[in-house]
């Protein structure tokens, strides 16, 4: 799959700058948090880069792009490099207070992996589900990208204080030994 149209991505990022979607800025980096509907081209590129990055470590969906139904209604936090006009990394983040009323427990990606007892439903309403995180290869050895994404998580929790919990699944690459994975 070809990369998303860069001019359209830049236009979407510029619109986000004019709204309340920028969480933070540090030198040439900006971290944004927004809905999928506001970033169709950026989201396409997130899906493409997610697949490329996961394949590089023996993971991935084996599809041309890694997007699923959850990407359409989850929020996306992404790290934008102003110097290169590209996405350096991203997280998918679902706000439980929005997901649960619309979709119930079935609306959470984690429900595909685990069975949630009804006693946990209130917790899920007050949770931010995180996942599908990546940093593209060119930025993985740089000190700031991971730090800024984590700082973006902090800013998100401050912006949405009704969410008391962060949760999500973690994939551990098969490149690690069984001992390391245990």
Predicted regions span which residues?
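Short, glycine/acidic-rich beta->alpha junctions
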Residues: 69-71, 148-149
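Generic detection of long, well-ordered alpha-helical segments
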Residues: 2-6, 36-47, 143, 147
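Intrinsically disordered, low-complexity boundary segments flanking structured domains
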Residues: 13-21, 64-66, 114-120
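Conserved N-terminal entry element of GNAT/NAT acetyltransferase domains
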Residues: 1-37
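Acyl-donor binding region in acyl/amide transferases
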Residues: 61, 98-182
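Short beta->alpha transition motifs characteristic of CBS
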Residues: 91-97
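Short amphipathic alpha-helix that is part of the acyltransferase structural core
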Residues: 23-66, 72, 76, 80-89
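A short amphipathic beta-strand at an alpha->beta junction
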Residues: 71-72, 165
């Amino acid at each position: 799959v070809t990369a998303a149209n860069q001019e359209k991505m830049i236009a979407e990022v510029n619109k986000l700058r004019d709204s309340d979607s920028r969480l933070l800025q540090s030198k040439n980096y900006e971290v944004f948090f927004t809905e999928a509907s506001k970033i169709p081209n950026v989201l396409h590129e997130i899906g493409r880069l997610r697949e490329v990055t996961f394949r590089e470590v023996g993971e991935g969906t084996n599809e041309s792009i890694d997007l699923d139904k959850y990407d359409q209604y989850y929020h996306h936090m992404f790290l934008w490099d102003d110097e290169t006009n590209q996405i350096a990394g991203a997280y998918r983040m679902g706000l439980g207070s929005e997901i649960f009323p619309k979709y119930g427990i079935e609306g959470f990606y984690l429900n595909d992996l685990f069975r949630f007892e009804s006693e946990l439903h209130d917790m899920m309403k007050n949770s931010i589900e995180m996942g599908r995180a990546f940093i593209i290869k060119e930025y993985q050895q740089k000190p700031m990208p991971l730090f800024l994404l984590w700082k973006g998580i902090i800013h998100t929790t401050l912006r949405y204080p009704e969410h008391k919990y962060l949760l999500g699944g973690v994939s551990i690459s098969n490149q690690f030994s069984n001992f390391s994975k245990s």
